């Protein structure tokens, strides 16, 4: 990785599809955590609670009210950079989605999914 | 040999899946009002959808990105969300229009209450989707849509003055707002974006790779060119039969009338059958398109081939869209009116979904050697300009003409 | 400023379609009669299918019902509108044409599978269309 890489990676990283090691689609990169100087990507942030901060300032308050408060570990997840295996058209993770808490909405354990007629 | 057959099947599916209720409504009315004068607009729209479809298919095959994946990446979350909300609203209207159209066609075939057929049609579509594999759905409705070829036969049977018909392909504008409204309507009806969003997601479901690029190009060029012929036939037969006697085809049944005039009951049944498959297929495509877009934008698991157990949110949202469409149709709004609004609003939303694809298709860092060449890039940008103009004038024209009501 | 202009344009666009309300003008009457002629033409085509046994009865019936409803709606619209005195006579003639048309469609609806009736309705539809067309000529011919 050369020094230009972080900026390029941020451009190719934000909003990308995330796949786990089984190729399961389990969310998108809703935000990125940067730390240090020069800044380095230290984690991917994923979850509905992060949507409001992606909107124009004026709409954020309303969006927060709809999305609900940020609860780390449930509607906002931190995926450490070490979990990232490979980046091409999508971000591939080393582990399984369930182990990282990702893709809960499509998880058979989800209360909504459990109530669907075909489950 | 097998490869040729496969390509032929793909082309046929594209051809049969090209027409939907928007084309039936706008092209027949355009013919009745302006005889062959708007054929050029059909051609303009057909080339446009072929350009867009070819790019989306190529991006999907090379980068494995469906349309709303590209949109979220290129536009970011905020602007992308605008594109998503607009597309979803248009898709919902489209599903309602197609479902209502399907129910009207069924009442013409089996005289019973309209609302009963709305519900039966929705249930029928769910059953078809539940039982058939992805390719099967596309093929059954695509092949069934080939019955629409009867309109080409009707055109030849009527044997219009082909010189006049050819003259209709020369673009002409007039200061009449109604004429301009129909120019926008006819182009927009051919350019309905859900078809492309559906087929590019379908390409990923069917595991397209760079090897599929030739198939993609043939589907787009040959399939849509042949589809365009069907769309032109609708204008020609209506222009020949309805224009001289001043018929205003305000409902779907009238669309099939020229086929009855030419070939009697057989012609009528072929026409109604073809319309049924076209509109039914479009109901499936547009509802799937709505669910694909939502799931892709939010990063959910998606795909008809993943099945409801592996992609529960995707499947559930598809059913919700279908259900909402049923409610819209049952509210009593005339499906033909819903169609007009769906088509006009679709072109208003189109630039936002077209631009990201155009940018990615031309970006070598994503597409490598398959990026837009000079011709594709030129065509792509020319059509972007066309779409932007249409998007700007569409709503003022809709208001000024009272949705074509004069 | 831009917003005010936009609002004015929007208001104008919204008001434009309603600008013609009030008395039934010669122009509006003309348009009404033209649409009656168009309905009659369509009725003639459907009836000819019935007469030649070249259609499906359900199709003819449902179409006759839909188009008949439109004819009736047109008749009511013409009958309810206040017409200016100069076109009073034409207005009454138009109402009569619309009424006849609605009757013909209801006959077609009842006898959608009957070739004999189909031929009769076809013939009458043609006559009604001629009446409507003559009325259009009168309305537009006398216009200043």
Listing of model-derived features with the role each one plays in the protein:
Chain C
Residues 28-106, 121-138:
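Alpha-helical segments in soluble extracytoplasmic regions
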Residues 108-122:
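Amphipathic, charged alpha-helical scaffolds that flank and support histidine-based chemistry
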Residues 1-21:
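Sec-dependent bacterial lipoprotein signal peptides
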Residues 16-33:
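C-terminal region of N-terminal signal peptides and the immediate post-cleavage residues
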Residues 142-144:
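Short, solvent-exposed mixed-charge patches
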